[in-house]
Structures are given as structure tokens and as C-alpha cells.
Amino acid sequence: MKPDIHPVYRTVVFHDTSANEYVKVGSTIKTKREIELDGVTYPYVTIDVSSKSHPFYTGKQKTFDSESSAARFQKRFGHFIGAKRG
């Protein structure tokens, strides 16, 4: 490998602000902020959504209407189909 062309790989703390959870992950992201966790200073990045807060991973998914698109169309516009012209 050539020297001085690869980004620095280091442990970074990602803070999920919606769940107030901290996750330490190896990353090459550049940050200006730092945080101290367990007596060690790490680069710090805030994020809005992670596996700690996303509904798919937490099991708090919303269920959507399972009615087919054809049934919805028929309900909305079915009265036009049988109407007489004239």
C-alpha cells in the first residue's frame, strides 16, 4: 500500500439522538467533535436513525391497509362505470 493515501480507520461513536443510544463502530468518517466514553476520547457523530430506533428493528412497525389497488379503485370510481350517458 502507498503511504499517506488511505483514510485513517478508527473507532467512532455514533449517537442515535432519537433513542439516546451510543454505538462504537470502526469508521473512516471525518469529524470535528469528540466525546469521552469510559475514560477514552472518541470522534463523535450524531445520527437521527439507527437499528436502535428504526421501527423495522425495534418491532414497532405500523400495519398498512391490505386492500388491493383494484378494490380501492372500484370503491372510488365504481359509480362511474355503471352510469348511463345521455
From Swiss-Prot:
UniProt organism field: Salmonella arizonae (strain ATCC BAA-731 / CDC346-86 / RSK2980)
Subunit note: Part of the 50S ribosomal subunit.
Gene3D superfamilies tied to this protein: Ribosomal protein L31 (4.10.830.30)
GO MF: structural constituent of ribosome
Name of this protein: Large ribosomal subunit protein bL31B
Keyword Ribosomal protein: yes
An example Gene Ontology CC term for this record: ribosome
Signal peptide (from-to): none
Pfam families xref list: Ribosomal_L31
GO annotation, biological process: translation
